[in-house]
Amino acid sequence: MRVLAIDPGAKTGIALYDTDTKFLALEIIPKGLEGFQRWWSFKGPLMLDNSVTIVCESFEAEEGTHGLDLTPVEIIGWLKGLGVPIHWQRRNQRGKGKLITPAVLKRAGLYPKRGELKEGHQVAALQHLLAYLVKIRHRPTIELLHPKEAS
């Protein structure tokens, strides 16, 4: 199973994971909607042709330290306009009750290595992706993230 997760924003985080091969790719797409559209025009058809499940953070606009940024809403609206099936994750679902923390990702070997992490949005996208797999009860992912203690 291949899953693509999107953490939309001015710098959009992307995580692509293949549960069979354990292939993981993380990206940052700068320049908001324009950058994401450019990225999608190149990679989107590849995702759709390869039966990739798409997961995206739903977004509730709230004012942050730098004011109100509606870039995520623009990206979500554009994705909805494509008519592509998307599984929506609320922001607070990504942690699944703190089950998918950076420490858990590191223990599972999924946290980006030093120098590979460009923005926290990559990790947020990965957390959305894994929260989706836990939600659908993908057993190998659950066991990878939370192996039973050795007896």
Which residue stretches match the model-derived regions?
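Phosphate- and other anionic-substrate recognition elements at nucleic-acid/protein interfaces
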Residues: 1-151
